[in-house]
């Protein structure tokens, strides 16, 4: 039992770090599952459920950190500020629609055909190269949108279209949306912030559907509940730290370091499994 709890701590740690950095949480979790297995009843169904729960822990961190900014009912806000918050939420919903529609239509097909190490490794490398290219291009371009409140509905839906690419494991939801935002002239910090906000309905919706599927097909024992709670808590706490750190980092640095990391990791993964 203790060993299984330690494994869930590791899973929560990986989720909390990789969900918000543009390096693909799904890709890292798929790789982790190849090396570390949880000893539970019906492991396949449980791992799907477990991944959902640790994602919800990560999402809760965004809600806590940005609660005032996201809360249109905050009594300390003026009428204009409340209107701005509602406007932000409408833009988030517009941005979520493309991936929600495509994800709903293709989710089962992608689970069956794309969730493997080859796809993960290739997408890690391709998006690593894309980040280096975009950051190089960005040096010669002026930032048009410096704050998340300046993002228009048109820009929101284009960022949402980029989020559709993240349906391929190894791409990174935050990586796809941040990359799209930068290409559209959004500052790194505003792009990262809007990416965090897009994650709330995107991940809650996807996680909610998988949660219901699991409950209709399986039951949870005491051990499973402890493992789920541990993973969720660790993911939440680590996400708090990572989100704060990333927002500080992007104000002074580019995403090039993440591009190099993706290329190196993707290459190592591809070589490892090809030589296995």
Please provide the spans of the model-predicted regions.
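Multi-pass membrane proteins that catalyze or facilitate reactions on polyprenyl-/lipid-phosphate substrates
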Residues: 1-276
